[in-house]
A protein has these predicted regions:
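Beta-propeller fold detector
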Residues: 53-58, 128-134, 177-185
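Repeat-based blade/solenoid architectures
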Residues: 62-86, 134-145, 189
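Acidic, small-residue rich beta-repeat scaffolds with periodic aromatic anchors
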Residues: 3, 7-51, 147-210
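Beta-propeller blade termini
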Residues: 13-15, 27-28, 82-92, 139-151
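Acidic, glycine/proline-rich Ca2+-coordinating loop motifs
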Residues: 59-61, 103-106, 110-116, 126-127, ...
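Short, surface-exposed coil-to-beta transition loops
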Residues: 37-39, 85, 101, 111-115, ...
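Beta-propeller blade repeat segments, especially FG-GAP/WD-type strand-to-loop junctions
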Residues: 45-48, 111-132, 167-173
Length: 210
């Protein structure tokens, strides 16, 4: 969710090492023990301190590493201090501009972290919601991986003893397209693996047993 009234934000943090272009100020509704959750906001500033945009989250969950306790006032935190990320920066659609993903709860596969994804619109000069990337970051096991070299996004999922790996390519004008799928079935002592690769718009399937 984008701009809205900030009637919460009892605990304030700032992250300066997450992006080359932006600093982020995080406000969380509730912080106890080693983590924060509840309604929250992420405010982006450029490196000169100019406010750029605000994002709201219904459940901005993040956890600190052991022996780190939040306190009152604005606290500077680094990614090395966190064991669960409230936000990610990266070029998620490979258009040369930095995008952002904001934690929206634990709506992923098996209760894993889920994120709202916003991509930078060079025409509007602001971040706009991406429905398909949000679905990719909310329906699997945590935030998707970004491979800048192959220009692919990777996600993982699990269903009982079966493990899934998916790779997507970002196609201009078409959005994200599934190009690779790996299924590992550990139901029995023998592991059955099925790999599907899209080659020249056709699926090539390989099955193995170990």
């Amino acid at each position: 969710m984008l701009l809205g009234p900030l009637c919460f934000g009892q605990h304030h943090f700032e992250i300066k090492d997450g992006s080359q272009k932006y600093n982020a100020e995080i406000m969380a509704e509730e912080c106890v023990d080693d983590g924060c959750r509840g309604k929250g906001s992420v405010v982006l500033f450029d490196k000169n301190g100019i406010k750029k945009q605000t994002f709201l989250s219904p459940d901005l969950i993040f956890y600190f590493k052991q022996n780190f306790k939040p306190s009152k006032g604005i606290m500077t935190i680094t990614h090395e201090m966190l064991r669960d990320e409230p936000l990610y920066f990266g070029d998620f659609n490979f258009d040369g501009t930095e995008d952002i993903a904001v934690r929206n709860g634990n709506g992923g596969n098996y209760g894993s972290p889920s994120y709202d994804v916003y991509v930078f619109n060079s025409t509007k000069m602001q971040f706009v919601p991406s429905k398909e990337l949000t679905e990719l970051a909310s329906g699997y096991q945590g935030m998707f991986g970004v491979d800048e070299k192959s220009k692919r996004l990777t996600t993982f999922a699990k269903s009982g003893p079966v493990y899934y790996t998916y790779e997507y390519e970002v196609v201009p004008g078409k959005g994200i397209v599934l190009v690779y799928e790996k299924i590992e079935n550990h139901t029995h002592e023998i592991v059955k693996t099925t790999i599907k690769k899209k080659v020249n718009n056709k699926w090539v399937v390989k099955k193995t047993t170990e």
